[in-house]
Amino acid sequence: GLIDSVYEKKKVEKKDLKSIVDQVKNGKIEGVNITVPFKKEIIDLLDHVHGDALLTQSVNTLCRRSNKVYGYNTDTEGFKESLRDGHIEYRNKNILILGAGGVTSSILEAFINNAKKIYITNRTKKKAEELKKLGDTSIATLQRKKETIEIIDWGKKPKICDIVINTTSVGLIKDENLDLDFKDYKNNKNVLFYDLIYNPKETNFLKDAKLRGNKTMNGKMMFLWQAQIAFKIWTNISPTIDDEVIRLLDWWLKLEF
């Protein structure tokens, strides 16, 4: 059946966050998705922060439970589902994460339980260190080695990794480049280069990887899977992700951008 509801996009400022949380609490709004830059700022306004959202300090979904406002993170599971969807094995692999912004903690959390080694590199090293500290908390809980996460200077690269992920916004604007050298990955068809950006659907980061002969994936399926999880939180209904849904998203992206 149909659900009698409307999903709207609103541009807000930090001062608007409390009002939005209050509207969820009093039933004027049933559910909310939060995007960068407010995924962390919203936490202090909530009654309860759930699981991954607490570990990552990143909330992207709000809902009401017994007149209390709950915060969830669907990015981590959405990202993992996108890898499963693409038949990408990520357990016991070496991972290189580029960036340390709003969504990066969710990507880090996805790998913490299973990766052999996780390297983080960011232009601002302090941000990478804060991210590592957050990750180390999860590692301690899982009783894994503290050396699982390592920070490397921007521009330097560790040994060949199995998955390289761009979590920065570089690539949103046409012809933007990360200015990182990956020529030693040439003809390595087992390495996955993953860009969280899904519009444009192929950034220069992915184009270059394809030219080198690497596997590539953009963030479109992560976007869909995290949305499915959020929808279930709100409605207890888990929509099917099929070719028609993907086609509708492609159509919407052309209109929106």
Q: Which positions does each model-derived feature cover?
A:
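Short helix-loop-beta connector
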Residues: R65, I88-N94, N187-K189
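Phosphate/diphosphate ligand-binding glycine-rich loop within oxidoreductases
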Residues: G1-G86
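Conserved S-adenosyl-L-methionine
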Residues: I112-K117, L211-K215
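Rossmann-like adenosine-cofactor binding region
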Residues: Q143-T216
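Rossmann-fold NAD(P)-binding glycine/threonine-rich loop
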Residues: V191-L248
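Glycine-rich adenosine-cofactor-binding loop
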Residues: G71-N73, L83, I88-I112, N122-R123
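Short glycine-rich anion-binding loops that position phosphate/pyrophosphate groups of nucleotides
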Residues: I34-E41, G102-V103, S169-L172, N199
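NAD(P)-binding Rossmann-fold cofactor-contacting core
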Residues: A115-S138
